[in-house]
Amino acid sequence: MLELTMATVSAEDAGATAGMLMADAPSDPGTVLRVGRDRAVCRLASPDDWLFVSRVHLEFLCGPDGSWQVTWLRGSHAEPPSEVLLTLAGLPMAQPLPYGGTARLAPGGSGELVIQDRTAPRSVNVGFYHEVHAA
């Protein structure tokens, strides 16, 4: 099972956790969880007026072996108005996830993706935990 938590943070409410959203999905091949502004297709949706977040920004996909990966989907802009940083538990520093890039999530692993606005002190913070059950 993949568990996601999402919080939106701006300069006015930095450090606040009010409004945290959660979603989870079983680790079945082909299962998808999306993060973005489009509430029709995204399980976790950011504010509609936060245009630095694409309609569908991040896609978590479960592969045939039950492992998960996350992709920063390319949007309508050649250069995105945001950046995405990936932090994995046990590693000291966040790494940039390239625009259109994919990262594999370790089974049983956890971490955080931060969608950072390049023009204002706002971010969407998405925590993840891949729960693995023994067979």
What are these language model-derived features?
Residues 43-46, 72-75, 79, 91-93:
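Functionally constrained cores in energy, signaling, and assembly domains
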